[in-house]
Amino acid sequence: MGMTTAQKIFSAHLVDEPFAGTKVLSIDVVMCHEITTPIAIADLMARGKDRVFDPTKIKAVIDHVTPSKDSKTATQAKMLRDWARRHDIKDFFDIGANGVCHALFPEKGFIRPGNTVIMGDSHTCTHGAFGAFAAGVGTTDLEVGILKGVCAFREPKTIRVNLNGTLPKGVFAKDAILRVIGHLGVNGATDRVIEFGGPVVAQMTMESRMTLCNMAIEAGGTSGICMPDQVTVDYLWPFISGSFGSKEEALAAYSVWCSDADAAYEQVIDLDLSDLAPLCTFGYKPDQVKSVTEMAGTQVDQVYLGSCTNGRLEDLRVAAQILKGKKIASHVRAILSPATPQIYKDAVAEGLIQIFMDAGFCVTNPTCGACLGMSNGVLAEGEVCASTTNRNFMGRMGKGGMVHLLSPATAAASAIEGKIADPRNYL
């Protein structure tokens, strides 16, 4: 019997199996940010274990509230900063160099097919887009990862999701993953890996694949995975060219991590996206999804474009295409947070930032702040936000606020009209 990508990674990284079904894996990359890591740091220090297993395998960034908004967040940032310096962690990104972790770390080339990746952040599954097993973990597991370079997992079964057809005009990766979550439900992939495949995935950029995998957790998934292919190699080539004689050689090496043709899946789901319309959430769960035509006319107070889901350059490009030469509705606050400094620079060079500002957007530094209601876009009670983020839980972006999740294209159209709007009318 063949193996899935996840099974291959588990087998290659197995260190111990202390209990039936529980496997201790060696970890290739431990990611850290200033919200969850300081808790682990403080506990390790209290127990006299202020050590790291390998500083070259730890990547750290201040990204959630940046610059710090108050003494509490400044203290959290300082703890991470001091810890990184104390342990000579070279890949630490402070104010000015920092970006949203799940956009910044792929941009830096830190992930490879077949890697194991952990972080104290539920959207760590983003990095599965590279053919890695990437999962968010709790504080105790993060501590063990930092100290020993290992982490225990129950080996997850894999759900294969084939995205068939071709995405229609005005429909993007965000719409595709909302369709998947709407089909599975918020608990449909609990303790499972969602392996994305099919013609739609084959046609996607790495940025779009990251959007897919980013929201695997919203269906309960431990991780999302796309099998490595030529698109993966092309994206990674600037970082791996010294290790391979050619892209063909790299592809052959990374293809060993692809699921075998006779791999056994717990479930195989086929979704034809050829007739998919732009989608939008309507409630307080990511699986509460309707077409934009059903949601059209819903008034919004704020539009937010950014986050680890949709703050990348291709997201900004499609939104700017819609916004060029137009103004946002007079009653709407529109906020753009490019996910990394490089994305910001590229957007400036391409004239995108000018388009956003001319339309009436406020452009912030790279930050996660608005997504979790901590800074740079918090909602007041009763306010409604059309957002390209990944969670619409009650109070997620501010106590008493309502969040509608949608694509950058739909967000841009909604900013112009001041209500949920169909982007196909502008493309």
From Swiss-Prot:
Question: Which reactions fall under this protein's catalytic activity?
Answer: (2R,3S)-3-isopropylmalate = (2S)-2-isopropylmalate
For molecular function, the Gene Ontology terms on record are: 3-isopropylmalate dehydratase activity; 4 iron, 4 sulfur cluster binding; metal ion binding
The record's EC number reads 4.2.1.33
Cofactor, free-text remark: Binds 1 [4Fe-4S] cluster per subunit.
Say which domain of life the source belongs to: Bacteria
Q: Which UniProt keywords apply?
A: 4Fe-4S, Amino-acid biosynthesis, Branched-chain amino acid biosynthesis, Iron, Iron-sulfur, Leucine biosynthesis, Lyase, Metal-binding
Kindly list the positions annotated as binding [4Fe-4S] cluster.
C308, C368, C371
Its required cofactor(s), as named, are: [4Fe-4S] cluster
Biological processes annotated in GO: L-leucine biosynthetic process
KW Nucleus (keyword) present: no
> Which residue ranges traverse the bilayer?
none
Transcription as a keyword of this entry, yes or no, is no
Its UniProt pathway annotation is: Amino-acid biosynthesis; L-leucine biosynthesis; L-leucine from 3-methyl-2-oxobutanoate: step 2/4
Subunit description: Heterodimer of LeuC and LeuD.
Q: Which family does it belong to?
A: Belongs to the aconitase/IPM isomerase family. LeuC type 2 subfamily.
- Protein purpose: Catalyzes the isomerization between 2-isopropylmalate and 3-isopropylmalate, via the formation of 2-isopropylmaleate.
Instruction: Return the protein name.
Output: 3-isopropylmalate dehydratase large subunit
Gene for this protein? Answer: leuC
